[in-house]
């Protein structure tokens, strides 16, 4: 499975998930956002190129914990659009997954 696919000037990042499922929501969110940063860097871009992110939480009670890590990560001068939903995630212990759409770095 591809980590990201470029179509023209748009990049679609696949679902970014934590590897360490023992961590709390803050640890899992940091790991996922680090993954987003790493994929964008591989493409020659950064979080400044991200247009939108969908955040999926296995428990909406984790919203504030995820959001605190998000607020520390996001550039307040250039925040992407974001939607957050409660869903059933693929693996037990997984608390967060994110997908993103970005402009392709030039």
Can you describe what each PLM-predicted range is?
Residues 1-106:
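Short, polar/acidic, helix-capping and beta-turn segments at strand->helix junctions
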């Amino acid at each position: 499975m591809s980590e990201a696919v470029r179509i023209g000037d748009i990049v679609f990042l696949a679902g970014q998930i934590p590897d360490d499922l023992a961590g709390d929501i803050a640890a899992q969110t940091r790991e996922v956002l680090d993954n987003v940063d790493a994929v964008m860097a591989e493409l020659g871009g950064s979080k400044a190129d991200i247009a939108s992110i969908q955040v999926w939480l296995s428990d909406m009670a984790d919203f504030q914990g995820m959001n605190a890590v998000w607020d520390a990560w996001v550039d307040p001068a250039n925040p992407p659009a974001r939607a957050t939903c409660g869903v059933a995630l693929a693996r037990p212990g997984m608390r967060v997954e994110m997908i993103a759409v970005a402009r392709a770095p030039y």
